[in-house]
């Protein structure tokens, strides 16, 4: 909550997306490998991790709500979504764990698309403050549509990939009788929708403040492909779910 927003803003967009979409998942992998597969953590510790995961998601989402730097908003969003992943792992039943593992993939696709869209916008406008932008959907339609699709996946709207993974996490919390956890997870999803739609509205809708043409096909093509993958991952979610269920079976062996 202190260093990651700065780490997401300072480097180039490509470095930031690798960090947000891939490198931050290393801690998730280590937790799953050590405390779900190798050791069985005490129930009190498990509940403590659940509480920290919920608080982490809420605080980071609140930070994204009040931030105006587009890359910093996405960095706060990464913290919030990692909290979501840890939430499913800490609930530690097969449904929630499956949702967390699936969301590692879905978040990676969508967040990479969001960071690259932000990079295209910054490269075209030379601005990072979303209050200084506006109306870019007129000049950058493909970037705008790709950003919107990836945002919908992170929010968890059907039929995109993020919907199924977040649904599994929430269902897992309910099965574990953690109703308050499921309720706060839903509230975090609402905050996620608010700050990402705020970014889309201020950057791409409204009055055109900065004339910024669409970038090269190679740049726009990458974000379009990531947005397309986010859609296909939702329609064909059964394919990654086969691997997720296999991994879940091994990780949660001690529950059987």
Give residue spans per PLM region:
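Cytoplasmic/organellar membrane-interface segments at the starts of transmembrane helices
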Residues: 140-143, 193-256
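Hydrophobic transmembrane alpha-helices and their helix-loop junctions in integral membrane proteins
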Residues: 1-202, 207
């Amino acid at each position: 909550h202190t260093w990651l927003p700065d780490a997401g803003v300072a480097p180039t967009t490509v470095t930031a997306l690798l960090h947000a979409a891939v490198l931050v998942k290393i801690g998730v992998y280590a937790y799953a490998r050590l405390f779900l597969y190798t050791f069985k953590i005490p129930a009190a510790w498990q509940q403590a991790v659940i509480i920290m995961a919920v608080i982490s998601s809420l605080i980071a989402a609140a930070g994204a709500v009040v931030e105006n730097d587009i890359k910093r908003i996405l960095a706060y969003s990464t913290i919030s979504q990692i909290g979501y992943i840890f939430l499913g792992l800490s609930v530690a039943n097969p449904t929630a764990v499956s949702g967390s593992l699936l969301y590692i993939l879905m978040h990676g696709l969508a967040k990479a698309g969001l960071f690259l869209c932000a990079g295209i916008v910054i490269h075209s406008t030379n601005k990072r403050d979303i209050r200084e932008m506006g109306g870019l959907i007129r000049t950058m339609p493909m970037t705008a549509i790709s950003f919107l699709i990836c945002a919908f996946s992170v929010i968890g709207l059907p039929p995109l990939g993020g919907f199924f993974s977040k649904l599994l996490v929430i269902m897992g919390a309910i099965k574990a009788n953690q109703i308050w956890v499921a309720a706060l997870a839903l509230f975090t999803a609402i905050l996620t929708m608010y700050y990402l739609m705020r970014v889309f509205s201020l950057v791409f809708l409204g009055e055109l403040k900065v004339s910024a043409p669409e970038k090269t096909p190679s740049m726009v093509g990458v974000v379009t492909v990531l947005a397309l993958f986010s859609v296909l991952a939702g329609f064909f979610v059964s394919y990654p779910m086969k691997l997720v269920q296999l991994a879940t079976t091994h990780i949660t062996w001690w529950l059987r």
